[in-house]
């Protein structure tokens, strides 16, 4: 039996292929609505799996085309991140037989596909070598994450990164090697090998500092049109992926343009800082609040996610400072959107966990440099 899957995000099509490749279905793919209509006429598939939000011809256009072409001979399954009931009703009225809301597990997608085509249900048992698919999820959004790396050869938690991209089919991790003098580049290339759809390596031959590494990574990732959001995360995973995913959920369900983690110590949270580091952080934060004119609790947490608009407009020019580029991002947003509007576009989300990892590159000496860089930012405003 033939299945045609249509989605403008290649990572979603790859996930569908992973879900169904161990079945007897003949799989075909289309990258947009126009191609889906053309392949539908060519292939006459038994099932079409279609996304609603595609450029040009939308999923609704595809539904209408199928409905008017073959009098219900082809089953149609909508797979979308849209959770509005009115959208779902509209899809069913347009001819959809099934509506799957993302995020959705690969095993659930496989079972629903087999059921709609009246095929034997093939559920992978816990003893199956491929049972790992049970925990793999097609995410609602496609998110690119820039991870700057400098001399991380011995610290990089490769297995943690592997497990994350295996379970979360909607993330692409871009590791930026910032001119490392050890074997970091080799470690990163080995990590990406065989996982090119989900992990890439961007190599900067010379060390330019964290700010420039993140900027180069963002500019590289923005070229990928499938990404709904782009963010960055420290390589030591002081902020873990669970908290980062919370940032993504926040921005995707709001009008915020950028959401950052906030290391606020509170009941129920595991926020661990060295005593001296905590004191300096508070001092720096007071200075930042005065510079920005905004009541931030924590601008310097290395976990943030943003819209494509912010990624495209706020990373064009190099940053003046190495450690305080987060502050410069907010200043650029303030200048671009205006002081009155910008505070409605920025969100701080408290983290559940943040741990100062051994071997962190930020030292007491660096903290003094940060204060000096704050003064540079202050003078550059005048």
PLM region spans:
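Alpha4 helix (beta4-alpha4-beta5 surface) of REC/receiver domains from two-component response regulators
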Residues: 61, 83-98
């Amino acid at each position: 039996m033939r299945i045609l899957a249509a989605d403008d995000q290649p990572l979603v099509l790859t996930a569908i292929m992973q879900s169904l490749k161990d079945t007897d279905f003949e799989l075909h793919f289309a990258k947009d609505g126009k191609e889906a209509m053309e392949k539908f006429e060519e292939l006459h598939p038994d099932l079409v799996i279609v996304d609603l939000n595609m450029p040009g011809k939308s999923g609704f256009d595809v539904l209408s085309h199928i409905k008017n072409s073959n009098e219900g001979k082809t089953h149609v399954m909508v797979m979308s991140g849209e959770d509005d009931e009115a959208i779902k009703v509209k899809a069913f009225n347009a001819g959809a037989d099934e509506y799957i809301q993302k995020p959705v597990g690969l095993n659930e997608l496989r079972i629903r596909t087999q059921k709609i085509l009246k095929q034997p249900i093939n559920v992978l048992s816990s003893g199956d070598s491929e049972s790992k698919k049970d925990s793999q999820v097609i995410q609602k959004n496609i998110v690119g994450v820039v991870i700057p790396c400098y001399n991380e050869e011995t610290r990089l938690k490769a297995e943690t990164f592997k497990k994350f991209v295996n379970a979360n089919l909607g993330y692409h991790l871009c590791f930026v090697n910032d001119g490392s003098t050890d074997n970091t580049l080799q470690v990163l290339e080995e990590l990406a090998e065989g996982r090119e759809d989900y992990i890439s390596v961007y190599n900067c031959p010379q060390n330019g500092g964290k700010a420039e590494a993140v900027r180069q990574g963002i500019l590289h990732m923005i070229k990928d049109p499938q990404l709904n959001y782009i963010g960055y995360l420290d390589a030591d995973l002081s902020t873990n992926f669970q908290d980062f995913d919370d940032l993504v959920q926040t921005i995707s369900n709001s009008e915020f343009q950028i959401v950052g983690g906030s290391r606020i110590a509170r009941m129920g949270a595991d926020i661990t800082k060295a005593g001296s580091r905590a004191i300096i952080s508070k001092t720096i934060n007071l200075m930042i609040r005065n510079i920005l004119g905004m009541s931030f609790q924590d601008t310097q947490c290395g976990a943030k996610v943003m819209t494509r608009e912010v990624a495209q407009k706020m990373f064009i020019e190099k940053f003046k400072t190495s450690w305080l580029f987060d502050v410069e991002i907010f200043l650029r947003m303030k200048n671009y959107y205006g002081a009155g509007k910008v505070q409605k576009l920025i969100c701080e989300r408290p983290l559940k966990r943040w741990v100062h990892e051994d071997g962190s590159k930020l030292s007491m000496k660096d903290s003094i440099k940060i204060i000096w860089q704050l003064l540079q930012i202050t003078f550059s405003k005048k």
